[in-house]
């Protein structure tokens, strides 16, 4: 084997240093990945745990920052010249590609943590050239320091770019604290080659080359590995606008955009700037993560002529859409319908379309004496030839004011979809209008219940006849919808009682209907008996009921504990609830309630870890919650799987004690997910369990945690830690409590 001059470029070479060598994942590729529960450790943050980004942002001279960004737009640098003397198009693409990785299925991706700075996003084929965009911004980031995060700066710069070219944006909110390491929780697909898609379609089984009839795996929202959305040349490079429309509708829909928002974003975004395909793609050097150290984090060094300016290659396409690419206009739509289009190729050999019988009047980006014919991408033509998109596009063409408003709103949604509720919005340009996709909840407009009221209500709830397990199950079902990824869900709003959550299979159970009915009666009785307008919301009452039941379970186990409770939640209405958007949040599996099963590609315990990460739980928090929820008898269907106790309903460490009992032998029954535990001597049946239960004995790291709670001195710690983890989940969405924002989660 030939030796490489640079070991960094030869993966078969193993560095003889700590952390190198064959890893556990190399030996056992299918081992459970717990690393996503250990992300964003405070020690990784150079700003320290005490740094309050929201306070820092609010101390920023915001409009001075915007002025500096606007000045940069036309300050062309020799090392990376601006197209048409204006960086607007480049910065719009940068912001779009930062925010556009968001997907509604799991809330991951998006611009919230500035992940475009890190692999793999910084090296995706779709992000060629954005390394230069971020470096252009460095002097501004350096000037304002920690008062502006990279996450906010990337998106704000896109907003300022639009404004600098004459477009009126809808507004902007800051508040995105930077992350300091790669987000390993995001699944970008199973392919091992850039631009591949042989795994993501139809479960990797069906003919993924049938571009007219294939299904993209959830939660993925891109047609190819390394692209933000779709191949602009058409599906798999086939210049078919109709087939491309199918891919567009799927991928933009996975990003929470409807057809009108999709048309507005494509037509609006392609009003500005150009694509780059001046020379062959094989003239581009390695991407940033593979580039030589001397490149200092830049990549794709271009050896074609000057490699920049008029000789730039990024996507390989060479298209300028409008006559005024640095000004807002309706020209994209005008040209789309004015001309017939014929297929051609860019200088780099990529499929694109040229206007038939058109004069050359489109400006060159660097030579004023040169003109070009109008050009379009295959995906642009989808807006004309897909019948649904065409209807919207023609309306926008005929009503430019509607187009501008739709683009402004869709762009705002694109940039803010993963920021969370309006309680997290900060800055002087936050729009006053409340939008449905922000999952609004009413403001508190009444006196809240006191500690004495809460105590009385807890007694009334426990005396209502509803099983404590049902109270706990309802509280968990409400609060555990929270996703730390996009900060959606949670107990605030009590949407557990509304469509679609109440119809979800995991929730459509007798215990939920009974509990809600009783709690609504208690609420009505309490509220009508109060003077001075004091009220308790169903949202608060659901959580309070869970608190009461957990406290009772601890008392019954011999431990007097007080589970924290802070009122202030309000009740959302059905009209405030976007049914489609919340439907995308329905869990495929929820191992905390022993709901769901393994598939041919995902084991049940992997769904459990995925859910725990979305709940921002650590591995100890995951373990203690599972152990507690099992002995509290809260399986969604009332089954006894994993209920390793002879005293269900008491908050004991029995789950761990009995799981670790060597007198029990386990065997698989009923498929891959169900197990039976029998006495090793007598063979008598003792327990049944699922993979969600037994993983705490089979996985070495989880077993180590289970042993702490299953030891003779583990009971008191178990109760204490369960209460802390329970309280954390109940309050994950309580941004109104003004908890200090942090990219790290609480650790046991």
Swiss-Prot record:
Keywords: Cytoplasm, Heme, Hydrogen peroxide, Iron, Metal-binding, Oxidoreductase, Peroxidase. It catalyses: H2O2 + AH2 = A + 2 H2O; 2 H2O2 = O2 + 2 H2O. Heme b binds at residue 270. It comes from Talaromyces marneffei (Penicillium marneffei). It is an enzyme of class 1 (oxidoreductase). Belongs to the peroxidase family. Peroxidase/catalase subfamily. Its cofactor is heme b. Transmembrane segments: none annotated. It is found in: Cytoplasm. The active site is at residue 97. Binds 1 heme b (iron(II)-protoporphyrin IX) group per monomer. Its EC number is 1.11.1.21. The keyword Transcription regulation does not apply. Homodimer or homotetramer. It holds the Pfam family peroxidase. This is Catalase-peroxidase. CDD domains: catalase_peroxidase_1, catalase_peroxidase_2. Bifunctional enzyme with both catalase and broad-spectrum peroxidase activity. Plays a crucial role in oxidative stress response during infection. Acts as an antigen and elicits antibody response in P.marneffei-infected AIDS patients, healthy people working in mycological laboratory, and healthy people in an endemic area. There is a cross-link at residues 96-229 (Tryptophyl-tyrosyl-methioninium (Trp-Tyr) (with M-255)). It comes from the Eukaryota. The gene is katG. GO terms for biological process: cellular response to hydrogen peroxide; hydrogen peroxide catabolic process. NCBIfam families: cat_per_HPI (TIGR00198), PRK15061.1 (NF011635). GO terms for molecular function: catalase activity; heme binding; metal ion binding. GO terms for cellular component: cytosol.
């Amino acid at each position: 084997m030939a030796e490489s001059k640079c070991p960094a470029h030869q993966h078969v070479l193993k560095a003889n240093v700590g952390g190198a060598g064959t890893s556990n994942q190399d030996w056992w590729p299918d081992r459970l990945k717990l690393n996503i529960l250990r992300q964003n450790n405070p020690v990784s943050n150079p700003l320290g745990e005490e740094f309050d980004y929201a306070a820092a942002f609010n101390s920023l001279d915001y409009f001075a920052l915007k002025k500096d960004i606007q000045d940069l737009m036309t300050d062309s640098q020799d090392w990376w010249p601006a197209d048409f003397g204006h960086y607007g198009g480049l910065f719009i693409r940068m912001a779009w590609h930062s925010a556009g990785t968001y997907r509604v299925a799991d809330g991951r991706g998006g611009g919230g943590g500035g992940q475009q700075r890190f692999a793999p996003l910084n090296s995706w084929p779709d992000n060629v050239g954005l390394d230069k965009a971020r470096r252009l911004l460095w002097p501004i980031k350096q000037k304002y320091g920690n008062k502006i995060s990279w996450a906010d700066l990337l998106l704000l710069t896109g907003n300022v770019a639009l404004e600098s070219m004459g477009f009126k944006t809808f507004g902007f909110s800051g508040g995105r604290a930077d992350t300091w390491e790669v987000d390993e929780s995001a699944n970008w697909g199973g392919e091992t080659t850039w631009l591949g898609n042989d795994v993501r379609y139809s479960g990797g089984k069906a003919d993924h080359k049938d571009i007219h009839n294939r299904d993209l795996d959830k939660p993925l929202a891109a047609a190819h590995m390394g692209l933000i959305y779709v191949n602009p040349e058409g599906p798999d490079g086939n210049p078919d606008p109709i087939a491309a429309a199918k891919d567009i509708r799927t991928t933009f829909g996975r990003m929470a955009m409807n057809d009108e928002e999709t048309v507005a974003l494509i037509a609006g975004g392609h009003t500005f700037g150009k694509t780059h395909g001046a020379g062959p793609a094989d003239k581009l050097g390695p991407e940033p993560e593979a580039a030589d150290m001397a490149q200092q984090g830049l990549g794709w060094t271009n050896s074609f002529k000057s490699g920049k300016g008029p000789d730039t290659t990024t996507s390989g396409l060479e298209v300028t859409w409008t006559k005024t690419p640095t000004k807002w206009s309706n020209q994209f739509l005008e040209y789309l319908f004015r001309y017939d289009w014929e297929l051609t190729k860019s200088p780099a050999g990529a499929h694109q379309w040229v206007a038939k019988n058109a004069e050359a009047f489109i400006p060159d980006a660097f030579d004023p004496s040169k003109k070009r014919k109008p050009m379009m991408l295959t995906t642009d033509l989808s807006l004309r030839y897909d019948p649904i998109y065409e209807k919207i596009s023609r309306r926008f063409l005929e009503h430019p004011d509607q187009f501008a408003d739709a683009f402004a709103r869709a762009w705002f949604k694109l940039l803010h979809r993963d920021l969370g509720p309006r309680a997290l919005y900060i800055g002087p340009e936050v729009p006053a209008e409340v939008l449905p996709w922000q999952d609004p909840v009413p403001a508190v407009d009444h006196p809240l219940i006191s500690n004495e009221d809460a105590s009385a209500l807890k007694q009334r709830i426990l005396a209502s006849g509803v099983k404590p397990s049902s109270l706990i199950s309802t509280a968990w079902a409400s609060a555990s919808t929270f996703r730390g990824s996009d900060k959606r869900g949670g107990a605030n709003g009590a949407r557990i009682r509304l469509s679609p959550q109440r119809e979800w299979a995991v929730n459509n159970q007798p215990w939920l209907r009974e509990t809600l009915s009783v709690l609504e009666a208690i609420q009505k009785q309490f509220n009508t008996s109060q003077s001075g307008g004091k009220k308790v919301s169903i949202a608060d009452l659901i959580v309070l009921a869970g608190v009461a039941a957990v406290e009772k379970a601890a008392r019954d186990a011999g431990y007097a504990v007080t589970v924290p409770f802070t009122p202030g939640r309000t009740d959302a209405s059905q009209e405030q609830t976007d049914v489609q958007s919340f439907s995308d949040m329905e869990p495929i599996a929820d191992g905390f309630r022993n709901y769901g099963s393994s598939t041919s590609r995902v084991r049940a315990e992997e769904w459990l870890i995925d859910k725990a990460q979305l709940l921002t739980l650590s591995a100890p928090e995951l373990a203690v919650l599972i152990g507690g929820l099992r002995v509290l008898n809260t399986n969604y269907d009332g089954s006894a799987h994993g209920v390793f106790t002879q005293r269900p309903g008491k908050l004991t460490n029995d789950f761990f004690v009995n799981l670790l009992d060597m007198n029990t032998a386990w065997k698989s029954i009923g498929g891959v997910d169900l197990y039976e535990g029998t006495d090793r001597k007598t063979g008598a049946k003792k327990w049944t369990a699922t993979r969600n239960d037994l993983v705490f004995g089979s996985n070495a790291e989880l077993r180590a945690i289970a042993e702490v709670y299953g030891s003779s001195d583990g009971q008191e710690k178990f109760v204490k830690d369960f209460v802390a983890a329970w309280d954390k989940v109940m309050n994950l969405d309580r941004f109104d409590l003004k908890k200090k924002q942090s990219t790290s989660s609480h650790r046991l």
